[in-house]
Amino acid sequence: MGPPKKSRKDRSGGDKFGKKRRAEDEAFTQLVDDNDSLDATESEGIPGAASKNAETNDEQINTDEYGAKDYRSQMQLRPDHGNRPLWVAPNGHVFLESFSPVYKHAHDFLIAISEPVCRPEHIHEYKLTAYSLYAAVSVGLQTHDIVEYLKRLSKTSIPEGILEFIRLCTLSYGKVKLVLKHNKYFIESPHPEVLQKLLKDPVIQKCRLIRSEGEDFIQGTLDGKAITQFGTKLPPGATDKPTPDPAAAAGADGTTAVPEDITDFYEKIDKEEEDEDEANLKTVSFEVAQEKIEVIQKRCIEIEHPLLAEYDFRNDTNNPDINIDLKPAAVLRPYQEKSLRKMFGNGRARSGVIVLPCGAGKSLVGVTACCTVRKRALVLCNSGVSVEQWKQQFKMWSTADDSMICRFTSEAKDKPMGCGILVTTYSMITHTQKRSWEAEQTMRWLQEQEWGIMVLDEVHTIPAKMFRRVLTIVQSHCKLGLTATLLREDDKIADLNFLIGPKLYEANWLELQKKGYIARVQCAEVWCPMSPEFYREYLTTKTSKKMLLYVMNPSKFRSCQFLIKYHEQRGDKTIVFSDNVFALKHYAIKMNKPFIYGPTSQNERIQILQNFKFNSKVNTIFVSKVADTSFDLPEANVLIQISSHGGSRRQEAQRLGRILRAKKGAIAEEYNAFFYTLVSQDTMEMSYSRKRQRFLVNQGYSYKVITHLKGMDTDSDLMYGTQEEQGQLLQLVLSASDLDCEDEKLPGEPGYRPSGSGGAVRRVGGLSSMSGGDDAIYYEHRKKNIGSVHPLFKKFRG
């Protein structure tokens, strides 16, 4: 085999940024490798209440032979249980009937106080956690409101252990806020006794800033009105309040089906929130020294009173406003408005995370947040492609132009002076190696700025230590994290709750699909039988070639080719994903399709993506895991997965998101997008596939199993149909190197080796390899013409 040939384009254009990229990649990898070793400092920023778990309450519960728990002794059924929508189990799990007349109210309430576990069509499951209750308090819900409304919604009595758990987790959360007001930092609370308790602590006493002798608490009111409208104004006479649902007040027979105590109390909570938003809340506060902010935050967490960060951006006169507004064409959908109301509920900007499905308009939410704050904005992305896409999103939805938006990547460094929005990547900010002079100047300017808002795209990918490094480099008043999948296969996702802020809002995928905001997707798992020769080798080999054998299965290749051909005839746009680069190249080259993977240059990526979007002759592209996140391809409506990263639930959801964008002008069918996973039968790939599907199944999606593709056997145009062709493919797979058998490693992943790094590589080859005959190329080295030389120098060189 030997190393692949290097094209003239790679040799000429690739060297320009090669050293710079390698240095950045090594720095990125080092940061993430450091994150794997968790030390004591990792848990310093987490309150003790966050470690509490409601599931410990049911350790003594009796179970039957099938493992079902008997909760009858703790949950007494109420007489009117048929009119109430949910059960609250002693282990903190909550079950909601989605067909209940008060489903909408109960759903909004549960999203605020709990984490969704599983949301199929009829019964939804949620889970009360310490973090979810922390998030509930942060958006204004009080302990007694949570307890009282749960009691009114529940079909049974609430177990005492759950009530105690809620009180423990919400007792001290949300009582104290850190506010930047008139360019000064204040610790603010509506509860004077809480501030008195804080000031008894010697560490916080030293951080207090006293302007005059005998100064007591500063009295004040929360005088900022809630921002309830974003984007396009409503027509005269219209209201932005949701209209009451007649079905919520009446049953099928026209009689009142909903107990009055539910609707009355919900209206009471709404009224209380409105009153708070109308700025009549009395507060007390004291000023603290700016240089002591980090010390105060850490100490408040230790004494179980974590500070909620809020930015009073309308009273910030130190940082100039930037001239940016939403365009009239930017109309927000209801769920986008709801998520932003959670962020700007009391006229200030709360830091936190918003979770929306891929294709549901996360970028527009980020752009709207920046237009609302109207201060300098910093947007952090995963890749250079997403930097370009964010720039286009700002130009599409807002009045920002090229002069206001600055890109800062290894290949595009715009001049930052005078710009109001900087878009860059995480690796550019956290890079520790030597930079170019131009990059050094931009970094110095970036660090000197006081950013009003920092938007973190795909926030779930940020390891804790790496994000902490971003926080130490960048000064920002408000942090907004955006993601579609707030989950990781490790437990580090919980760190985001206190590094950024609580989860502010999470949308329901199936509801958005029913309303047409995202595509209606048919998910299918295609079973591909292993050919006898491939399966024999699969059973006998004990090396990493097992994975390559089931990915390169001839039956899988033929299924992929058949599906591509079928959907191209329909006029569909298809993306084929493969984590394994050896398979990616082989499939793409054999089918004569363009492909994108790690080493593909930025310009080539953009060219391929533009052709895919606008060229009717390019209907299929092959991509590696580089396209898992931040690739905006609204035209794609078919996705075929031939190789994946083990049992990663997050990757499955992110890939589905590539085709989730609502389809304009689609044929009126039951489904307008298709997601295929090709799986080799009787291999470990089937086990991985089951694990990967868990998250999407919990969102309400179902997978159709296809064991036979009708018409594939009679199609003579498909490759690898004969035993001879399959034998040649098997020899190609067996002669592949160990490196070819591995999945692609991207910067930031364990085991990533930057291109050009040293180290021995094991390869399989013939005798010609030993003589250096593999992939030999002729190359001329020409000396640069240095022009005329002075006679004096000629004399010395002679």
From Swiss-Prot:
Domain Helicase ATP-binding: 343-504
Signal peptide: none
Pfam families linked to this entry: ERCC3_RAD25_C, Helicase_C_3, ResIII
PANTHER family reported for this sequence: GENERAL TRANSCRIPTION AND DNA REPAIR FACTOR IIH HELICASE SUBUNIT XPB (PTHR11274:SF0), RAD25/XP-B DNA REPAIR HELICASE (PTHR11274)
Disulfide bonds: none
Gene Ontology CC annotations of this record: nucleotide-excision repair factor 3 complex; nucleus; transcription factor TFIIH holo complex; transcription preinitiation complex
Helicase C-terminal domain residues: 558-713
Recorded family membership: Belongs to the helicase family. RAD25/XPB subfamily.
Coarse class of the protein's main subcellular location: nucleus
UniProt GO MF annotations: 3'-5' DNA helicase activity; ATP binding; ATP hydrolysis activity; DNA binding; helicase activity
Region entry Disordered, spans: 1-62, 235-254, 746-765
Subunit structure of this chain's protein: Component of the 7-subunit TFIIH core complex composed of haywire/XPB/ERCC3, XPD/ERCC2, GTF2H1, GTF2H2, GTF2H3, GTF2H4 and GTF2H5, which is active in NER. The core complex associates with the 3-subunit CDK-activating kinase (CAK) module composed of CCNH/cyclin H, CDK7 and MNAT1 to form the 10-subunit holoenzyme (holo-TFIIH) active in transcription. Interacts with PUF60. Interacts with ATF7IP. Interacts with Epstein-Barr virus EBNA2.
The protein's name in its UniProt record: General transcription and DNA repair factor IIH helicase/translocase subunit XPB
Gene, per the UniProt record: hay
Function: ATP-dependent 3'-5' DNA helicase/translocase; binds dsDNA rather than ssDNA, unzipping it in a translocase rather than classical helicase activity. Component of the general transcription and DNA repair factor IIH (TFIIH) core complex. When complexed to CDK-activating kinase (CAK), involved in RNA transcription by RNA polymerase II. The ATPase activity of XPB/ERCC3, but not its helicase activity, is required for DNA opening; it may wrap around the damaged DNA wedging it open, causing localized melting and twisting that allows XPD/ERCC2 helicase to anchor.
Motif residue range(s): DEVH box: 457-460
Record's subcellular location: Nucleus
Catalytic reactions on record: Couples ATP hydrolysis with the unwinding of duplex DNA by translocating in the 3'-5' direction; ATP + H2O = ADP + phosphate + H(+)
Motif, Nuclear localization signal: chain positions: 6-22
Enzyme Commission no: 5.6.2.4
